């Protein structure tokens, strides 16, 4: 497969056939948001319901179209976590065989600066610090929405997208100036 003049190698694609699954992709960039659509939803004729941060509603397209579809835009501040968890679980209701749900377990794009900021805020949390030390290119999962999705799962398969190569496109400017592909 070729996209943005990049070549992709996909292993195990046969396992994606059948009823739509729950998607949990790594989130390292703006560009990697298209991976589930291009390599999963479109080829298999599936629709995904998305859990997205409410800050994206500043984009009029996402505000208008995203709210007309069964997606959820969550407040990540933690002010109303229980409501957000209920909203994520509700995405599972009424799923057809060709509909799945996508959540980014990390809750944000990975960057070294975000990782180090989290380390500073949680310096007294030994378990989290150990996790940060083990997973050098991941943010720890934010468990509220992910667990709500899993708890309300009626038996759908889980698909994890553990991709690499998009780290250089964590900001919109990287996409425009070609810096993420070494231009």
Language model regions located:
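A Trp-anchored, charged/polar loop motif used as the substrate-binding/catalytic surface
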Residues: 81-93
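A generic local structural motif
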Residues: 7-11, 36-38, 88-90, 145-147
């Amino acid at each position: 497969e070729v996209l943005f003049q990049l070549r992709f190698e996909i292993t195990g694609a046969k396992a994606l056939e059948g009823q739509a699954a729950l998607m949990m992709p790594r989130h390292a960039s703006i560009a990697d948001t298209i991976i589930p659509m291009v390599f999963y939803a479109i080829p298999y004729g599936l629709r995904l319901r998305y859990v997205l941060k409410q800050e994206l509603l500043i984009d009029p397209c996402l505000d208008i179209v995203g709210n007309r579809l069964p997606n959820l835009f969550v407040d990540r501040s933690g002010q109303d976590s229980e409501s957000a968890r209920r909203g994520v679980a509700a995405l599972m209701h009424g799923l057809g065989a060709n509909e799945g749900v996508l959540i980014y377990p990390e809750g944000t794009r990975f960057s070294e600066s975000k990782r180090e900021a989290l380390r500073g805020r949680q310096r007294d949390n030994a378990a989290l610090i150990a996790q940060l030390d083990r997973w050098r290119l991941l943010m720890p999962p934010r468990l509220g929405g992910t667990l709500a999705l899993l708890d309300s799962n009626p038996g759908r398969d889980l698909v994890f997208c553990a991709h690499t190569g998009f780290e250089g496109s964590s900001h919109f400017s990287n996409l425009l100036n070609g810096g993420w592909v070494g231009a």
